[in-house]
Curated annotation (Swiss-Prot):
CDD domains: L-arabinose_isomerase (cd03557). Pfam families: AraA_central, AraA_N, Arabinose_Iso_C. Keywords: Arabinose catabolism, Carbohydrate metabolism, Isomerase, Manganese, Metal-binding. It catalyses: beta-L-arabinopyranose = L-ribulose. Its cofactor is Mn(2+). It comes from Salmonella schwarzengrund (strain CVM19633). It comes from the Bacteria. GO terms for molecular function: L-arabinose isomerase activity; manganese ion binding. This is L-arabinose isomerase. Its EC number is 5.3.1.4. Mn(2+) binds at residues 306, 333, 350, 450. It is an enzyme of class 5 (isomerase). GO terms for biological process: L-arabinose catabolic process to xylulose 5-phosphate. Belongs to the arabinose isomerase family.
Amino acid sequence: MTIFDNYEVWFVIGSQHLYGAETLRQVTQHAEHVVNALNTEAKLPCKLVLKPLGTSPDEITAICRDANYDDRCAGLVVWLHTFSPAKMWINGLSILNKPLLQFHTQFNAALPWDSIDMDFMNLNQTAHGGREFGFIGARMRQQHAVVTGHWQDKEAHTRIGAWMRQAVSKQDTRQLKVCRFGDNMREVAVTDGDKVAAQIKFGFSVNTWAVGDLVQVVNSISDGDINALIDEYESSYTLTPATRIHGDKRQNVREAARIELGMKRFLEQGGFHAFTTTFEDLHGLKQLPGLAVQRLMQQGYGFAGEGDWKTAALLRIMKVMSTGLQGGTSFMEDYTYHFEKGNDLVLGSHMLEVCPSIAVEEKPILDVQHLGIGGKEDPARLIFNTQTGPAIVASLIDLGDRYRLLVNCIDTVKTPHSLPKLPVANALWKAQPDLPTASEAWILAGGAHHTVFSHALDLNDMRQFAEIHDIEIAVIDNDTRLPAFKDALRWNEVYYGFKR
């Protein structure tokens, strides 16, 4: 079972009574056929549910009102099978607070050249019915997506499925609770921000709990529960000699298991699906949570270090969006560079907390090594390299008057040399279009040093995310040129200034 099983998307057909009962009967028949086929063949992440025809203002308004109050409804897909005068949609769209997609399709793929008549033309009017609907969306400044293509086309299936992921993610975000264990890393700017503005814009709440509250739960974990989790570690990872039974770091592994169980219990009891820690606030914990955080991220929790609640929330959102897709998604940090003409590289990592969903190894190494930062006992962690191939890194920043999402398209590569003295998980990548352009654009746009790294999602996913939440996006990819990028930032400043 996945999060998508908790939601459904309503399929709404727009028409009108002008064409008579027989035409509406055929419209309904076509709609039933299309919805059944999409649910059976399109591999959509959640179920489509056909709703009654929308043929009058009252019917349409009732559907939109019901969608708002049905917790299972993630959004609406609208198909204008015939012409549907758009003034009928104004009241409904004005109250709709769920994501909306127009599926610009028609029942037949090919025109019946020899038999086409006006009855056929009146029945199959998506071509101009969709344009009428599009006008009222533009006139009302109604954010909505459009997918054009025949309902049997696999590309259309893929695009509808991607939008569904956004719709479900948006509903999950409205319920998201972010727990901060302690506050920000002292004096750091980009990890701070306006939590009230974030809740207004995205819906997620951010609150702080004392580390002592967590410690109480951690200390209540039984030895039996720890032993069971250690057995899971033994079967899932390659343990170094120091971490095995009778190894001199075995107790550190047991303490890491205690912290993991305590953190998970605390998060479950509070209904949290994202959290932060900071190495400056660990009072009562014997080690910085490393292994615990890595495993919780793999289970779908959002996380970021040093109190960075925006990145923690973004990671959870992207975890939901990517559920069931190939490839992983993780907290990440641009750590250090390799400068080589024509082969500039970025080594990404963090002190400990990189999600094993991006690991290339089937069994990452579980080890315990010294960590000077934090002043605690040596923490347990998983060590691995990252899968190669196309990926993205994304950062959500607070500019005071708006949020900006930065996305850099990257290409992860194999580490050319072993890293015998680097005791943390890592990712190595080439930034698009090149490191000087990418880093300068990122810095000029205010991108954070913390990011969400993903093999599972791509730039199109993040564009949709920005659109569905009505936030600015700054893209850095192979098409980026710094002069044009700077101009776009200036234009955005004016545009969003007018929107205030």
